[in-house]
Amino acid sequence: MIDSINQMTNDYYKSENLISTKEHFSTSGKYKLIVETYITKPGCWNYTKGIIHNIETGSVIQEIKRNYCVFHHSFFFKNNQEWLFCGKTYYSQCFINLETGEIFDNSTESKPDSFCWANVKSNPNGNIIIVEQCIWGGPYEIGFYDFTDPSIGWTELEFDNYQENYYLNIEWNYESKWLDNDTFEYIQKEDYSTKFQKFYDELTVEEELESSAIENDLVSRMYYRVVLKKIDNKMRFMVTESSPQHLIEIQNNNE
């Protein structure tokens, strides 16, 4: 299913293989990403190409060919300059400084068992990025990376005093934000029945049916909360906060 980057470049990116085009605009509105999708061959996934334009000048900043059917990308800011994250392969990363056109890519160093990145957000100054990532076929999780100097790469920041009961899961509903350049808050949220004063997973079948008949009975409520801080080049768990139901879950897991 996977071809080399060189073969991918030479074989598939032809006008007769183009099947769709979609536009995406940067946060500032100054840049436009056009994602083109190309059919490859029977039994294989499609490939994509991202073309990044400066809207004011009309110039093409970069063109990125990707060996996967989804062109994962994110716009973010670093030191007041706008950047684009994408990837030439599904297991590598490519960063483009949209102000200068400079590109940083690790596709030649990455391997198929590397993390696959789906989304990137930066801290306020852009020196730390949080990543929604997974090993191919595995569950998604949040990772943190040092993005101080992309010319020397981006090293993953390990967790300090990791708390397994406060897993940074993105498979369910969650909220996150940077409290400052080094401090990050994550809130795991779950549906909660206001009538029965229970989380949805605790409802009986009868209660589920009754709840579903009540308009807006289910609300999103905190299940647990975590605050992490970058200290000595690691992300340390500083605060953990649980709902009563989560405390019961922890107790049951420890028995």
Model segments located where?
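Short aromatic loop motif centered on NTY/YTY
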Residues: 117-119, 128-136, 143, 153-202
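Generic structural motif
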Residues: 7, 20-21, 31-40, 47-50, ...
